Amino acid sequence: ISNISSGPKLFQLYVHKDQSITDDLIDRSRRSGFDAMCLTVDTLVAGNREKDHRTGFTTPPKLTLQSLMSFAMRPSWVFNYLTGKKFELSNVKKKTDKGTNIAKSVIEYINEQYDPLMGWKDAEYCAKKWNGPFALKGVMSVEDAKKAVDIGCTAIMISNHGGRQLDG
């Protein structure tokens, strides 16, 4: 991205259970010329997404009569899936083989590596390690906004990402 864009760049970070992955992402972002870091704290666990339940969307996808009919009506989807480039989590592929090839492994990676127990000490560690413009995304209260400033955040981001996760 740094090679093709002269605009400001922000890296969105999630804390991993394996500290070396988090450290590597921060270090690589700095070396790649990112200007700011944003730690996302509002989607650490998957929510109850009611629309997905209504439409039958699952991860990993389940073969149902409806999905089989969709595949049959769109054979190019199946062809592209079977012959195309396999999905990979490029940022962490050197650290893990999870997140490659099939949707199930992406979810396994998120469940195994994203740390739902991360707290203020983790956020402070990331802000200090980054040592530059640092935002906390998903702040939900005035008290949390003040705490974010206290640990070294230079910005906060208020979003409905986590709300959507929790509310469906």
Segments (PLM) and residue ranges:
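Active-site entrance/lid segments in N-terminal catalytic domains of soluble metabolic enzymes
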Residues: 1-150, 154-155, 162-165
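Shared catalytic-loop signature of beta/alpha-barrel
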Residues: 168
